[in-house]
């Protein structure tokens, strides 16, 4: 304690001596010390201010990221809702087309519509950002449509073949009936004995024309 008091006295004595010999030197030293302290305080205040501004900027960035994320979620939900409505509509249309197919009433226009549905879903799968469950649902829908389209095409071709066969058989029956009227008692498939080659050729041409 005594040493500290002695040091203070010594400092005061030095300051007093300097004040007598160099007026203003002590005041300048004290001013410099105050300025140094003020600068230190100013630096700390600036540092705190910079940190606060940085924190505000980070918070604003977080808010912006949150807004973008929420916007993506809303957009994705709307897309899911729209896709769900479209799929329900398509399934309803496919049920009608399937009923027409079973009844043999599927038209060319309906077949084209099925093909269009396949193409639309293929393009949609490329353009949408789908998760695994959505991709699986879309693939199942495409498979269902393709099965209906293939089945419808087979039915249409089968109906066309049956119609051609029926027309051919009707024409054949007409020719046989004509021959029976002209040549009573003739065995089916045989020409009469006294028929000339020219007449036989004429009959064959007539039969070919009726087939066509």
Curated annotation (Swiss-Prot):
Residue numbers spanned by region Disordered: 26-49, 152-212
Keyword hit for Transcription regulation: yes
Cross-referenced InterPro entries: Rrt14
Extent of Basic residues compositional bias: 157-166
Source taxon at top rank: Eukaryota
Pfam families attached to this UniProt entry: RRT14
Keywords: Nucleus, Transcription, Transcription regulation
Extent of Acidic residues compositional bias: 195-212
Its job: Involved in ribosome biogenesis, probably through modulation of rDNA transcription.
Protein's UniProt name: Regulator of rDNA transcription 14
Organism for this UniProt entry: Zygosaccharomyces rouxii (strain ATCC 2623 / CBS 732 / NBRC 1130 / NCYC 568 / NRRL Y-229)
Gene: RRT14
